[in-house]
Amino acid sequence: MAVSLLSKLRCITVDVTGTLIAYKGELGDYYCMAAKAIGLPCPDYKRVHEGFKLAYTDMAQMYPCFGFHAKMPNIVWWKTCVRDSFVKAGYEYDEETFEKIFRRIYSTFGSAAPYSVFQDSRPFLRWARSQGLIVGLVSNAEYRYQEVILPALGLNKAEWDFGVFSGIEGIEKPDPRIYKLALERAGNNIAPEEVLHIGDSMRKDYGPAKSIGMHALLLDRFKTEAAKDWTEAGAIVLPDLVAVQQLLESDKLKC
């Protein structure tokens, strides 16, 4: 006889960026503002943003997990990425000028300034813990998320029990091993079928979590075109964490 999923869950894991928090504006905006702040002409926002996407992709391929396996310091990884972002956008600065720009960018993204917390994030995490569930975060993010950024945003250990961050662990989504590591961190011999993972990517969240036996569902906060494909592929897709809580409490999800 089928029973409600909530009654069987012992742990919920949650993606961070796009699920609990979001960037304010485009990343390229902050790069341009940093250049402008030291008296330089404002670079073209769109070009810099596109340059960043290319540079970030290159760095993630050459030095995954923010340089973890190459033992590259986090600040060096980001300095290379930021420099390449500007170069790919057609902007090259001398070393002294670039250092001033970079210091501003690195400091900004190590603070709460460029991020916002979705209104339903804290209430959902608190609700989950009130149900006796262990709450974990699983994110392709560097160490500053855990140590600085999330606490500065008010998402501290009062809201979650453990975190698995790619820049600290050396494993990143969509590698299923990051979800196996989350199971280990949850402790208490929790089995995959006792865990629900919530994220915003079919490839990085839903697929690998399901592949190791976890339950999973996806959020479509920004009404993406891909959401229709997710639904057609069999995923449960919801607009926000309020809807997730309502669905779990309704006992409509069975296992």
Regions found by a protein language model. Name each.
Residues M1-I12, P43, E92-Y93, R122, ...:
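Asp-based, Mg2+/Mn2+-dependent phosphohydrolase catalytic module
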Residues A2-F118, P123-R126, S130-Q131, E147:
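N-terminal helical cap/lid subdomain that shapes the substrate entry/recognition surface
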Residues V82-R83, G132, F165, A235:
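Intrinsically disordered, low-complexity regulatory segments enriched
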